[in-house]
């Protein structure tokens, strides 16, 4: 019989540079005093994102595992999630009362999805700098993730993107699913993201 808790597993995906690691840093720093948190990061040949989170002091180093996927990072979160599942298990055994493990995918495209075996909830991050067309391009990350975050809204005027157009496209592409417009650098939208995690993840409100 296992002597540790099964944590809520939240997959965090999105293209390179969209703000996945920034999201994890701010979530860890905000939630770590209330909940027991750990993180698994995926990089192709390095443990760069794990190092970034450790250096930012988002969590203690023993709460972060960096998985080096080699080859295609999508496979490690979908078809063969064994390395990630093993990392989640290791963290759960190491910290027996974990509430949440975030699993950050390697930089992926709009078609990447998490295996249901690996993630109980999925958050997908895109950013305004990629252009206002991104939501209407669709793909499972846009249409099927449990929460979509449109990050870096402060850049809209500089890249000629209309947030109104992005919002109407997003609402059309995922009519029944939630989304948040955010500027994670400044903490804009963070309260809604945390509310989603606590409510949908059925975490005990503390």
Swiss-Prot record:
It comes from the Bacteria. Its main location: cytoplasm. Pfam families: cobW. It is found in: Cytoplasm. GO terms for cellular component: cytoplasm. Keywords: Chaperone, Cytoplasm, GTP-binding, Nickel insertion, Nucleotide-binding. Gene3D superfamilies: P-loop containing nucleotide triphosphate hydrolases. GTP binds at residues 14-21. SUPFAM superfamilies: P-loop containing nucleoside triphosphate hydrolases. GO terms for biological process: urea catabolic process. GO terms for molecular function: GTP binding; GTPase activity; nickel cation binding. Belongs to the SIMIBI class G3E GTPase family. UreG subfamily. PANTHER family: UREASE ACCESSORY PROTEIN G (PTHR31715:SF0). Facilitates the functional incorporation of the urease nickel metallocenter. This process requires GTP hydrolysis, probably effectuated by UreG. Homodimer. UreD, UreF and UreG form a complex that acts as a GTP-hydrolysis-dependent molecular chaperone, activating the urease apoprotein by helping to assemble the nickel containing metallocenter of UreC. The UreE protein probably delivers the nickel. This is Urease accessory protein UreG. It comes from Aliivibrio fischeri (strain MJ11) (Vibrio fischeri). The lineage of its organism: Bacteria, Pseudomonadati, Pseudomonadota, Gammaproteobacteria, Vibrionales.
